[in-house]
Amino acid sequence: MGMGVIMRKGYIYTALSAIIFGLMPLLTKIIIARGATSLTIAFFRVFYVTIVLFFVLKLKKIDFHLEKRDLLSVMLTSIFGSGLTIIILNESYNYVDTGIATSLHFLYPLFVAILCCFFYGEKIKKKQIISLSFALVGIICFMSKGNGSLFGYFLAIASGLTYAFYLVKMDKTGLVKMNALKLSFYLALFTTIEIFTINLFMQDVVFKMDAIAYGLLLVLALSASFLATVLLQQGVLLLGSTRASFICLLEPVTSMIVGILFLGEALTLNKGLGGLAIIISLIIFLKE
């Protein structure tokens, strides 16, 4: 298989992942309206996936065994990467508008480039700097006016850093070369344990919900924490963490379109300019 075909597959996988993630705010708002909290959604997203993947691995007869080195890498990636990202991003929604929090979270391509530069000696190319500049302009445009605290801004930005850690750790430790279903299972398992432990102190996970809410949580889990996550893992494997993180910028654009079409959100000048800036960013980045 030629390098061009491999790269195209990587771009498609990552773009599909970003689009699926971008659809999640619509489903999340519906579930919250039925009595769930942000931490409830975070918990059941990974809890459901852990159970489903356990039986999938059993049926496919995939070995559960992990080498000690891989076990440590998966634990660190889950607890301080994907798990911590879900927790602190959801917590930031309690302090700032969700639009601002999500926009600040999308500083993570910058953090990915910085982490790869400082810890792995990768050079930041001129094209990446130009592309990232447009992306930052787009993110700033997406930031709607609203009240918020500095602590909320800090949490949202920190979630971008932890997500960057997740992407880089998967790429540089070779975790993406592991069976995708097996990796997703262990990431979900450790994140479930992490959120459950935190809830022992916070008591914020709601269990008294109707059947529809539980059904929607299952759909959310299978689409976001399973399908989109596996697609992203394959995208990182084929593209590397830096390229993949830029393609993920399709997510806020998707969220904006979904908000306008289904949530009655207005198409403001800032949103339009933000979407255009991110599209330009992607065109520059993808241009050979």
Task: List the predicted regions and their residue ranges.
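C-terminal-most transmembrane helix of multi-pass membrane proteins
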Residues: 7, 46, 55-58, 130, ...
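Glycine-/small-residue-enriched transmembrane alpha-helix faces in small-molecule transporters
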Residues: 1-40, 44, 146-172, 193
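Hydrophobic/aromatic residues within transmembrane alpha-helices
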Residues: 31, 41, 45, 92, ...
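Specific alpha-helical transmembrane segments that line the substrate/conduction pathway
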Residues: 40-42, 46-50, 89-123, 159, ...
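Small-residue-rich packing faces within the transmembrane alpha-helices of Major Facilitator Superfamily
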Residues: 22-23, 47-51, 136, 189-193, ...
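Transmembrane alpha-helices of multi-pass small-molecule transport proteins
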Residues: 33-84, 111-112, 162-169, 184-203, ...
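Hydrophobic alpha-helical transmembrane segments of multi-pass membrane transport proteins
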Residues: 16-23, 27, 56, 73-95, ...
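Hydrophobic transmembrane alpha-helices of multi-pass small-molecule transport proteins
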Residues: 53, 115, 124-143, 160, ...
